[in-house]
């Protein structure tokens, strides 16, 4: 790899790449600075005028479940440096960065992870053929001939590949189709979450950045949706640079790559990844510098806006009226001929899978609560309620239980419309709807938790509790139906605008865009940071099509299509104090209503013995994990930190992989004294491990008493890369709190 990079990315070429990157970044950041003032004004105006969607009926979780481990298990990873497959212990913490450890013992002994993968911008592939097609398209002229050795050989029939158009790729495989399905759901959840990297609560910086991206691309005649608007600001900015830099680099270096087609493909992936990392570091520095400059200027800008808000609004409305008079006749004709006829079909294509997905969310929530209620009646009663509710609180973050909801969006197609409206991919809309589904599920669960916690304060009997659970479920479902309708209608409006506005702007550009500079003289110089002609022009275009979009969504609601409420229907708040309940301390179900020591069978004395107490602590630790497919690896042999076990020969069959896995487990652990029951908790060593002092980033390790559960921050998906962050051998390892079940057993809800 080093030879490839030193040959094709020498100092002169790196300098050339840095200069081109600098030019692109400088041009984009001018757009960002312009949009920052507009976004700040819009945000402050919104606060003062109080405009916004109707108040939601469901509560939302203000304190996220940030101590949860989403998933953990074993999988095989292909090591590109030695071309071997290695078994890795992997987990996904609450921040959705895939963390890969050498093995489970390394994780338990707090050895730094091998890698932390930020999956923003990646695609999850389940077929080597799919992957080879994408790789072949990325570098024309390198398609392998029939019968030749491909770039990747998978030893099983169940691969999972993380593919990125610019960054390095990751190769995994599983032993069974069931494992592949589980990991696919988990990795898709990681991608979905990491793609949504700009915080929702960023009311100024976020909108300014996305508007700047759109304006910059439109200045390059690139309209329509952009599939690589993925990740945080620096990742998106890196994608933007690579979109321009990549083709020229490919044309320059592609013909110089030597070897067979698959070898040239491998070389190009290495080069592209190296360039992407260079671009990322440069983009990060530039973006942070500009952001700091804008934040320093923000107080002065806010003072001007507060003082002159009315004058700024008047000036903007005057400008809008002049632009409207100029473009309205052309815009209305364009809307009538090219957009209006297609709005119903676009809306129908969006409504069917989206509404099916939200209905599935409702059904899954209903089933989980009903099953819990039956368990309360038939098994544990109030004593087990804490355990049941601890699991229910994690429902929205359970990749497999939510998968049936997310899958409803997969059939979304805009056949015949994608080319007309320049929609490069429907993945933008799929992921947005799926994120809404997860949010609404969590809101429903949290509202149910809050109402049930209030009911428990009355000290109900088991029978009264079951009736209360059913009554609360019905109340929450009514609130869910209302909020679901509001969220879907807003999603439909936004999606229709996202599809039609770029198309209209592109259609109107030849006759209108060149005339816009003459409107600049209508803006007072003092207000020029808060009013831009280009933005006002886009708002006027939006208004010309907005009435047709609103009418189409309204008609769908009037027809009661897909269970949408009419705009005139307002659900009166039957719980006036409900939102006050959400202001309290987050509910810890395990602590407040957990099992007091009687696990439902056998003798239980007055106070638990030390082993029982340890088991209880372990149970509570396990309750904080959403799901697991962890192999049993109890530690029994001494473990040498930082020693890489010798790599075995590359296995080419399932049998060899099974043998490799068995060898790893024997080397890392002694066999349990007796077979573990299905789903039984695995006893883990509670002995604290001495870790030598090291450099940041991790916080100093405290000495903990034996048996004390450690609950510190897990590794975060690094924003300094496109894919992987490898911890240095000397750095202090992050510590996790997790729970694992016996071999191959998923944590049951």
UniProtKB/Swiss-Prot annotation:
The record's section on InterPro entries has: Niban-like, PH-like_dom_sf, PH_domain
Q: Which residues carry this modification: Phosphoserine?
A: 568, 574, 607, 628, 647, 650, 669, 674, 685, 695, 699
**A Gene Ontology biological process annotation?**
gonadotropin secretion
Keyword vocabulary terms for this entry: Cell junction, Cytoplasm, Lipoprotein, Membrane, Myristate, Phosphoprotein
| Coiled-coil zones | none
Q: Would you indicate the residue range of the signal peptide?
A: none
Primary place of residence?
A: cytoplasm
Q: Where is the composition biased (Basic and acidic residues)?
A: 710-719
- All copies of the PH domain together span 68-192
Key word Membrane present: yes
Regarding the membrane, this protein is recorded as: Lipid-anchor
Q: Where in the cell is it found?
A: Cytoplasm, Cytosol; Cell junction, Adherens junction; Membrane
Q: Where is the lipid attached (N-myristoyl glycine)?
A: 2
Q: How is it modified after translation?
A: As apoptosis proceeds, degraded via an proteasome-independent pathway, probably by caspases.
Q: Which cysteines are joined by disulfide bonds?
A: none
Please give the Gene Ontology molecular function terms for this protein: transcription coactivator activity
Under the cellular component aspect of Gene Ontology, which terms does the record hold?
Answer: adherens junction; cytosol; plasma membrane
Summarizing the function annotation, the protein's role is:
May play a role in apoptosis suppression.
Family to which the UniProt record says this protein belongs: Belongs to the Niban family.
Give the protein's recorded name. Answer: Protein Niban 2
Organism from which the protein derives = Mus musculus
Q: Which gene encodes it?
A: Niban2
């Amino acid at each position: 790899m080093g030879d490839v990079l030193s040959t094709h990315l020498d100092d002169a070429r790196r300098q050339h790449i840095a200069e081109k990157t600098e030019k692109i970044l400088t041009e984009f950041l001018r757009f960002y600075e312009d949009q920052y003032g507009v976004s700040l004004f819009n945000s402050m105006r919104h606060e003062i005028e109080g405009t916004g969607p109707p108040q939601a009926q469901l509560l939302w979780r203000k304190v996220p479940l940030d101590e949860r481990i989403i998933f953990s298990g074993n999988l095989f990873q292909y090591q590109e440096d030695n071309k071997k497959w290695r078994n890795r212990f992997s987990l996904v913490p609450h921040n959705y960065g895939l963390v890969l450890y050498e093995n489970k013992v390394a994780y338990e002994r707090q050895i730094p992870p091998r890698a932390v993968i930020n999956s923003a911008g990646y695609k999850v592939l389940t077929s080597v053929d799919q992957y080879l097609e994408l790789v072949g398209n990325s570098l024309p002229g390198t398609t392998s001939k029939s019968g030749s050795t491909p770039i990747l050989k998978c030893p099983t029939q169940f691969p999972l590949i993380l593919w990125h158009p610019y960054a390095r790729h990751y190769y995994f495989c599983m032993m069974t189709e069931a494992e592949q399905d589980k990991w696919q759901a988990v990795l898709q959840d990681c991608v979905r979450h990491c793609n949504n990297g700009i915080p929702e609560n960023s009311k100024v910086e976020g909108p300014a950045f996305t508007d700047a991206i759109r304006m910059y691309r439109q200045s390059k005649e690139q309209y329509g949706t952009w599939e690589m608007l993925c990740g945080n600001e620096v990742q998106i900015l890196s994608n933007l640079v690579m979109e321009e830099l990549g083709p020229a680099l490919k044309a320059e270096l592609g013909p110089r790559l030597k070897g067979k087609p698959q070898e040239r493909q491998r070389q190009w992936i290495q080069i592209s990844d190296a360039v992407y990392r260079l671009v990322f570091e440069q983009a990060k520095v530039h973006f942070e510098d500009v952001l700091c400059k804008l934040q320093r200027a923000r107080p002065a800008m806010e003072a001007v806006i507060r003082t002159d808000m009315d004058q700024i609004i008047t000036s903007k409305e005057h400008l809008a009226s002049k632009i409207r008079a100029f473009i309205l006749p052309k815009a209305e004709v364009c809307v009538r001929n090219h957009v209006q006829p297609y709005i119903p079909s676009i809306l129908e294509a969006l409504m069917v899978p989206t509404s099916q997905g939200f209905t599935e969310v409702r059904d899954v929530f209903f089933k989980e609560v009903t099953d819990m209620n039956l368990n309360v009646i038939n098994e544990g009663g109030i004593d087990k309620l804490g355990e049941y509710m601890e699991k229910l609180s994690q429902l929205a973050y359970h990749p497999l239980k939510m998968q049936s909801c997310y899958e409803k969006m997969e059939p979304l197609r805009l056949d015949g419309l994608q080319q007309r409206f320049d929609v490069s991919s429907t993945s933008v809309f799929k992921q947005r709807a799926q994120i809404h589904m997860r949010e609404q599920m969590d809101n429903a669960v949290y509202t149910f938790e809050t109402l049930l916690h209030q009911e428990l304060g009355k000290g109900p009997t088991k029978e009264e509790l079951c009736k209360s659970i059913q009554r609360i479920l019905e109340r929450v479902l009514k609130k869910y139906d209302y909020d679901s309708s509001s969220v879907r209608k807003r999603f439909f409006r936004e999606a229709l605008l996202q599809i039609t506005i770029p198309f209209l702007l592109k259609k109107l550009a030849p006759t209108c865009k060149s005339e816009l500079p003459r409107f600049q003289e209508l803006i007072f110089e003092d207000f020029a940071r808060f009013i831009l002609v280009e933005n006002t022009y886009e708002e006027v275009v939006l208004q010309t099509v907005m009435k047709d979009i609103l009418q189409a969504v309204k008609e769908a609601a009037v027809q009661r299509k897909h269970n949408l409420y009419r705009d005139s229907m307002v659900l009166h708040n039957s719980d006036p104090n409900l939102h006050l309940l959400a202001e309290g301390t987050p509910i810890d179900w395990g602590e407040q209503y957990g099992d007091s020591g009687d696990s439902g069978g056998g003798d239980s004395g007055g106070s638990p013995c030390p082993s029982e107490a340890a088991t209880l602590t372990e149970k509570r630790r396990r309750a904080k994990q959403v799901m697991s497919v962890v192999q049993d690896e109890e530690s029994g042999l001494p473990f040498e930190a930082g020693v890489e076990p010798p790599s075995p020969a590359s296995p080419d069959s399932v049998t060899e992989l099974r043998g490799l896995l068995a060898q790893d487990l024997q080397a890392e652990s002694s066999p349990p004294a007796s077979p573990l029951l299905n789903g039984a908790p695995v006893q883990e060593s509670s002995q604290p491990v001495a870790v030598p002092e090291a450099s940041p980033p991790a916080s100093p390790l405290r000495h903990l008493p034996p048996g004390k559960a450690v609950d510190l921050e897990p590794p975060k998906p690094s924003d300094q890369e496109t894919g992987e962050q490898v911890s240095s051998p000397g750095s202090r390892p992050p510590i996790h709190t997790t729970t694992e079940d016996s071999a191959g057993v998923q944590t049951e809800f």
